[in-house]
């Protein structure tokens, strides 16, 4: 987004929701426009790995033998995490969370401590998001376009080209 922002203003128009990853990609924008009822935020990170080993063995008789280069080389759904693997995953989740909160702090021009106060995976309505600085104004796509026109200094001379993604899979039928 930084490369795009060097060329032109980047404005985000949030729909019904733009949380977690949606907020991650929105935070660095020059402006964020959302509806009062938009659900956003969810500044948090988690990791999980299914442990189906016991069920696979009991119900289906499936067992797994593994050959590995080191103790943590076989993360698998066929067994639970060891304490070492759990610690490694937590460290990774913590690192991504720090990256996420720093990105929000920089993108929204907020102190990291303030972001940490509103983060923790909590979801906010558009009303709350405006109060705490996660969005800049209320509105829909038309409002976001008006913000973009203003920030780009386009005046009255501009046109809008709507680009729609081509349907894929069953939607293409």
Q: Residue spans of the language-model regions?
A:
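Amphipathic alpha-helical substructures
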Residues: 109-139, 144
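Short polybasic linear motifs
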Residues: 155
């Amino acid at each position: 987004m930084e490369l795009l922002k060097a060329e032109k203003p980047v404005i985000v128009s949030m729909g019904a929701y733009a949380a977690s990853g949606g907020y991650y990609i929105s935070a660095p924008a020059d402006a964020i426009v959302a509806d009062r009822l938009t659900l956003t935020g969810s500044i948090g990170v988690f990791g999980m790995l299914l442990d189906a080993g016991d069920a696979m063995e009991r119900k289906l008789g499936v067992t797994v033998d593994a050959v590995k280069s080191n103790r943590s080389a076989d993360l698998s759904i066929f067994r639970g995490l060891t304490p070492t693997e759990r610690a490694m995953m937590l460290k990774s989740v913590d690192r991504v969370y720090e990256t996420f909160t720093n990105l929000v702090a920089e993108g929204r021009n907020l102190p990291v401590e303030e972001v940490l106060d509103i983060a923790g995976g909590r979801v906010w309505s558009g009303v709350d998001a405006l109060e705490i600085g996660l969005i800049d104004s209320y509105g829909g796509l038309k409002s976001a376009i008006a913000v973009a026109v203003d920030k780009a200094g386009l005046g009255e001379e501009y046109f809008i080209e709507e680009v729609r993604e081509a349907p894929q899979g069953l939607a293409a039928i």
